[in-house]
Design a protein with these regions (language model features):
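Aromatic- and acid-rich polysaccharide-binding/catalytic face
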Residues: 2-22, 48-49, 225
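Extended hydrophobic/aromatic segments used for targeting, binding, or gating
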Residues: 5-9, 27-29, 33
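Carbohydrate-binding surfaces of carbohydrate-active enzymes
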Residues: 25, 33-55, 59-259
Length: 259
């Protein structure tokens, strides 16, 4: 990964609550695991509107949602938050007609971002004032927030990038389809919704490590929690063995690797 490349997340939780709070925490753990040391955590598309994306009254977030979620991100070492979509607008017509009933650069029609804090007509949403206030508070304390680090317990969460590279597989291979289904099930599954959540509810703070790369984590006397599947690269298994041999403790949740 190039040192000039800065990765960022898309965060759309539609309300941070008990049911999904572990998702936000693990997003940052996994991003931290693959980022270079000089790359702070960032969210380039951070949900900040009303969540009524089809303008039918189908969503309405609490006025405090963007503020609260942003504070939790910053507390977990996130250093850049791009409120998205902050200002609505209009999608231009395509020069070459598509004859699809829309003929615009986006599928949303002419008006875009009608759920944003500032809608296409410039009208302010009920979410605007709270976002403005929280942003000003953050900027006023920027020098302190930029230097702070989350205090963590001696617990790590392992991340295997290959487990998530399942967007495409050869459609004619039943074997590959079964493999993708297996990885999709065990790479997150109940491990996110039970074990990771229980760690957080019991006040454990933890970071993420990339198991496909050597790192200082292999020398730590820590507890490493890993959502595992039948499939696991030999290099990953060897690193885990070295971690345990060096005094670390390994907790596998899911399946014991067999290939």
């Amino acid at each position: 990964q190039s040192d000039e490349f800065w990765a960022g997340s898309d965060i759309y939780l539609s309300g941070l609550r008990l049911q999904n709070m572990q998702d936000l925490y693990l997003i940052h753990c996994y991003m931290e695991a693959v980022n270079r040391q000089n790359m702070p955590l960032a969210s380039f598309e951070f949900q900040s509107g009303e969540a009524d994306y089809d303008e039918s009254g189908n969503g309405r977030l609490d006025v405090s949602d963007a503020d609260f979620t942003a504070r939790m991100c910053i507390a977990q070492n996130n250093r850049l938050i791009n409120h998205y979509l902050f200002t609505g607008g209009r999608n231009m017509l395509l020069k070459k007609p598509r004859k699809d009933g829309n003929n615009r650069i986006a599928i949303t029609g002419e008006r875009h971002g009608f759920t944003a804090p500032v809608n296409p007509e410039g009208k302010l949403s009920y979410t605007y004032d709270r976002i403005r206030r929280s942003t000003r508070v953050t900027l006023a304390n920027a020098c302190r927030l930029a230097a702070m680090q989350e205090e963590r317990d001696n617990v790590l969460v392992g991340f295997i990038p290959d487990y998530f590279m399942t967007e495409y597989c050869y459609p004619g291979s039943e074997r590959e389809k079964k493999m993708v289904q297996h990885l999709t099930r065990y790479r997150t599954g109940s491990g996110w919704d039970t074990f990771a959540k229980m760690l957080l509810l019991n006040h454990y703070a933890f970071g993420g490590v990339n198991l496909q790369e050597d790192g200082s984590w292999m020398e730590k006397k820590a507890v490493l929690f890993l959502l595992s599947a039948d499939y696991m690269d030999a290099g990953v298994q060897e690193r885990l063995c070295r971690f345990v041999e060096n005094g670390g403790s390994l907790l596998l949740y899911g399946r014991m690797p067999v290939m």
